Amino acid sequence: MIGLDTNVVLRLFDLSDSKQSAAVGRLLTMPDAEGNFLLNPIVLSEFAWTLQRAYKQPRTAIADHLDRLLQSPEFVIPFLDEALDSVRRYRDGRANFADYFLAAINRSLGCNSTLTFDEDAAEGDLFSILKA
């Protein structure tokens, strides 16, 4: 298995560098590509953040891109169920994808809640507000 950095994953959607995009395309269409590439939680979070901040993508487009990654057989995704739930929450909520994802992972690891000062994140059942 091979881990992928965020900038490699972004080249699936940003074709501005044709050489890099082609290299990623070749990599993912190799005969043994299925299940061979790791997308860890940090990469997924950076991917969503970069699409939002640098590429000014709307929330729905970011959620669609994340869904596409999560359903691609080439990728091994730790905490897949948590990632899928986080995309759903992100699509309908106000917090960032990374907020939902880290709280979903925390819950899967036994946490009852995740404390935050972020009122947007605290709108659902994953977070609790820490009063200052």
Give residue ranges: language-model regions:
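Short, well-structured N-terminal submotif of metal-dependent ribonuclease cores
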Residues: 1-39, 54-60, 67, 131
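Histidine- and aromatic-rich ligand-binding microenvironments
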Residues: 5, 40, 95-96, 118-119, ...
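Active-site neighborhoods of divalent-metal-dependent phosphate/nucleic-acid chemistry enzymes
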Residues: 74-113
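Amphipathic alpha-helical segments within well-ordered protein domains
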Residues: 48-52, 87
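Regular secondary-structure segments
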Residues: 13, 28, 70, 84-87, ...
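Short, conserved alpha-helical segments within structured domains
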Residues: 40-43, 82
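A generic structural signal for short hydrophobic patches within well-formed alpha-helices
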Residues: 9, 44, 121-122
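Acidic, PIN/NYN-like endoribonuclease modules and their adjacent C-terminal/linker elements
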Residues: 1, 103-132
